[in-house]
């Protein structure tokens, strides 16, 4: 009996109880849920349905809970149903009824946990989108991990996900980048507002290697040469770093194309026709206050140049024209103001503001022995993606960055995350998977095979706890996807690995000595294979490897 099966049984039982006592069945909520109690002594599952219904139907919740418990006790698969507190019902499931969770996992394999809750949704997920003026910094690295995991997570729930990188190659930061390259090429000091680091020297030298006469060109041609080649080299490095990190994108959109293609002008024309644009002090303004922003925003500045929001407007309109019904933006901690701005832009263009979601990520710090780490010479004072991967590896870096809610600043302890110990969360989970793979190899050597015909033999409390946790995986994925919180998958995997290690320490899976393989061995091996599958599925969502040996 899965949690979903139990919830359906509870709803049907509650409807029958209400009918029997001439009470309003319409009071039942559309969705009934069961939860796992924090204290295992309180049962396998619990429900507060009687507390939800009592006031609505005019019955004391504890009395109503008693009626539910009596009816549930008579149902197939329910071992015990007891009333607790003011109206909770605690439930214990018969061992024979829990085996379906194992068979479901083994049947679904890599798709176990998937659902169709977002079937038909066309999602554009834009993340990282770092300026092409330097390597990916640690904040962008967090988005590279979290964004990729969120894309994988939404896909398991039926969404069609397009991962997109908005290439910010338009604006003053590109001018400063070009100035820095030219200064380096000429052997001059870095401009006051320029970019420093070994990477600037490297790129400047590569530009000269590709265009040996560049320093002899007229200034405008010289700048354009450094711009075109330098930006391309930097972006090539960024894409390679992200690829090596396990994060790839389906679409790369250039901000500059929004302006050169006329799409900014098209967006402004559409907004003008809608009455959302006005002119004041020689500038063109968008009435974002009409849609919840704290002030109207300049779209075209008084000098005739487009403000940054102009590109955002054109870019959002471009996404909608490509058929996306949900546009998720993942932005840095200094972009809180963009939430109202982007939603207002969507509303001004005639869309529901809820077609735009903005996730704001907080800062990441690296520490060693409790002290902040400054490690990048190549990027000046910035800690980069490449630095982090070099220090702790791709798997640990991704897991460490995904493991906490994005709205929480995090400190990554380099010694902890590079250690082969149970205190290292990614090692703890991966070791459980490797241990399960080793168990499967040993089982094959001993002639023990998986058999699901005798899962009713799995009556040990540690077996039950592990089975029920396997049953939680679909619900964890649904919740994590709906809340846009892939860190929930990390926490679940750590909890599941703990249940497995406790099961393994308490329940002998394979025969020893002259003992012949039996039905219990085969049933426990089936449980182990199901556990291995769920851990592998979870790690795949995170973009973290599931090693077979460690």
Swiss-Prot record:
One GO MF term attached to the UniProt entry: arginine-tRNA ligase activity
Alphabetical UniProt keywords: Aminoacyl-tRNA synthetase, ATP-binding, Cytoplasm, Ligase, Nucleotide-binding, Protein biosynthesis
GO biological process: arginyl-tRNA aminoacylation
SUPFAM superfamilies named among the record's database cross-references: Anticodon-binding domain of a subclass of class I aminoacyl-tRNA synthetases, Arginyl-tRNA synthetase (ArgRS), N-terminal 'additional' domain, Nucleotidylyl transferase
Motif 'HIGH' region positions after renumbering to this chain: 130-140
InterPro entries noted in UniProt: aa-tRNA-synth_I_CS (IPR001412), Arg-tRNA-ligase (IPR001278), Arg-tRNA-synth_N (IPR005148), Arg-tRNA-synth_N_sf (IPR036695), ArgRS_core (IPR035684), DALR_anticod-bd (IPR008909), Rossmann-like_a/b/a_fold (IPR014729), tRNAsynth_Ia_anticodon-bd (IPR009080)
Subcellular location: Cytoplasm
UniProt-listed PROSITE patterns: AA_TRNA_LIGASE_I
Domain of life: Bacteria
PANTHER family from the UniProt entry: ARGININE--TRNA LIGASE, CYTOPLASMIC, ARGINYL-TRNA SYNTHETASE
Subunit (UniProt): Monomer.
Annotated family: Belongs to the class-I aminoacyl-tRNA synthetase family.
Protein name listed in UniProt: Arginine--tRNA ligase
Organism, scientific name: Mycolicibacterium smegmatis (strain ATCC 700084 / mc(2)155) (Mycobacterium smegmatis)
């Amino acid at each position: 009996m899965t949690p979903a099966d139990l919830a359906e049984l509870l709803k049907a039982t509650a409807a029958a109880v209400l009918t029997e006592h001439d009470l309003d069945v319409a009071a039942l909520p559309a969705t009934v849920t069961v939860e796992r109690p924090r204290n295992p002594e309180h049962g396998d599952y619990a429900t507060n349905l009687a507390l939800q219904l009592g006031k609505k139907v005019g019955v004391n919740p504890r009395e109503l809970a008693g009626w539910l418990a009596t009816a549930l006790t008579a149902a197939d698969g329910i071992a015990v149903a007891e009333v607790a507190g003011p109206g909770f019902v605690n439930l214990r499931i018969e061992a024979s009824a829990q085996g379906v969770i194992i068979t479901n996992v083994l049947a679904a394999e890599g798709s176990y946990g998937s659902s169709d809750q977002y079937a038909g949704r066309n999602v554009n997920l834009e993340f990282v989108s770092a300026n092409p003026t330097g390597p990916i910094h640690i904040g962008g690295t967090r988005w590279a991990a979290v964004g990729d995991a969120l894309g994988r997570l939404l896909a398991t729930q039926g969404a069609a996900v397009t991962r997109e990188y908005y290439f910010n190659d338009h604006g003053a930061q590109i001018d400063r980048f070009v100035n820095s390259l030219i200064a380096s090429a000429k052997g001059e000091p870095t401009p006051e507002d320029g970019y420093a680091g070994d990477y600037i020297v490297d790129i400047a030298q590569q530009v000269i290697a590709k265009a040996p006469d560049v320093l002899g060109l007229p200034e405008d041609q010289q700048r354009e040469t450094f711009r075109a080649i330098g930006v391309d080299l930097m972006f090539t490095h960024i894409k390679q770093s992200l690829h090596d990190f396990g994060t790839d994108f389906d679409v790369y959109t250039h901000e500059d194309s929004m302006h050169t293609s006329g799409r900014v002008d098209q967006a402004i024309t559409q907004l003008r026709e809608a009455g959302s644009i006005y002119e004041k002090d020689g500038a063109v303004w968008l009435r974002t206050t009409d849609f919840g922003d704290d002030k109207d925003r300049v779209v075209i500045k008084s000098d005739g140049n487009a403000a940054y929001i102009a590109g955002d407007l054109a870019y959002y309109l471009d996404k909608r024209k490509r058929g996306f019904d949900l546009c998720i933006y993942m932005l840095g901690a200094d972009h809180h103001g963009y939430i109202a701005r982007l939603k207002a832009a969507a509303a001004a263009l005639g869309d529901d503001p809820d077609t735009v979601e903005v996730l704001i990520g907080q800062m990441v710090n690296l520490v060693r022995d409790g002290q902040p780490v400054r490690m990048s010479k190549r990027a000046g004072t910035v800690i980069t993606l490449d630095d982090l991967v070099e220090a702790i590896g791709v798997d640990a870096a991704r897991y460490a960055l995904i493991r906490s809610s994005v709205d929480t600043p995090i400190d990554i302890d380099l010694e902890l995350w590079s250690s082969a110990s149970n205190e290292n969360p990614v090692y703890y989970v991966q070791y459980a998977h490797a241990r399960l793979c080793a168990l499967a190899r040993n089982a094959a050597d001993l002639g023990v095979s998986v058999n699901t015909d005798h899962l009713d033999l799995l009556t040990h409390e540690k077996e039950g706890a592990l089975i029920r946790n396997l049953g939680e995986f679909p619900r964890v994925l649904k919740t994590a996807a709906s809340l846009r919180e892939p860190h929930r998958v990390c926490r679940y995997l750590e909890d599941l690995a703990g249940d497995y290690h406790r099961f393994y320490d308490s329940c002998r899976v394979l025969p020893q000595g002259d003992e012949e393989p039996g039905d219990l061995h085969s049933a426990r091996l089936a449980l182990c294979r199901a556990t291995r599958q769920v851990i592998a599925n979870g790690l795949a969502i995170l973009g973290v490897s599931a090693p077979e040996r460690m």
